[in-house]
Curated annotation (Swiss-Prot):
The gene is rpsS. SUPFAM superfamilies: Ribosomal protein S19. Gene3D superfamilies: 30s Ribosomal Protein S19, Chain A. InterPro entries: Ribosomal_uS19 (IPR002222), Ribosomal_uS19_bac-type (IPR005732), Ribosomal_uS19_CS (IPR020934), Ribosomal_uS19_SF (IPR023575). One of its GO terms (biological process) is ribosomal small subunit assembly. Belongs to the universal ribosomal protein uS19 family. The keyword rRNA-binding applies. The lineage of its organism: Bacteria, Bacillati, Bacillota, Clostridia, Thermoanaerobacterales. GO terms for molecular function: rRNA binding; structural constituent of ribosome. NCBIfam families: rpsS_bact. Keywords: Ribonucleoprotein, Ribosomal protein, RNA-binding, rRNA-binding. One of its GO terms (cellular component) is small ribosomal subunit. This is Small ribosomal subunit protein uS19. It comes from Desulforudis audaxviator (strain MP104C).
Length: 94
């Protein structure tokens, strides 16, 4: 279930303030955030935001197509390494 339309999209006030400040000063530096739930706003286009995935901060460069999505969508929390493979030892046991 998504967020109610009457409430509008959510973005962390601290993150939004940092982005606005960087836009005013015309700066481009990486902004670290733990707020995966924040919606990407048009003001964020062109900035790199380091989103925490539970282990490290993943740099996400914001493009126009990302507006309206959540930051967490672009920093996966789980890495799938595949199922176990057959080895010489495991096939010899049969």
């Amino acid at each position: 279930m998504g967020r109610s339309l009457k409430k509008g999209p959510y973005c962390s006030p601290k993150l939004l303030a940092r982005i606005e400040e960087m836009n005013e000063k015309d700066q481009k530096r990486v902004v670290k955030t733990w707020s995966r739930r924040s919606t990407i706003f048009p003001q964020m286009i062109g900035h790199t935001i380091a989103v925490y995935d539970g282990r490290k901060h993943v740099p996400v460069y914001v493009t126009e197509e990302m507006v309206g999505h959540k930051l967490g969508e672009f920093a996966p929390t789980r890495t799938y390494r595949g199922h176990g493979h057959h080895t010489e030892r495991s096939t010899a046991l049969k």
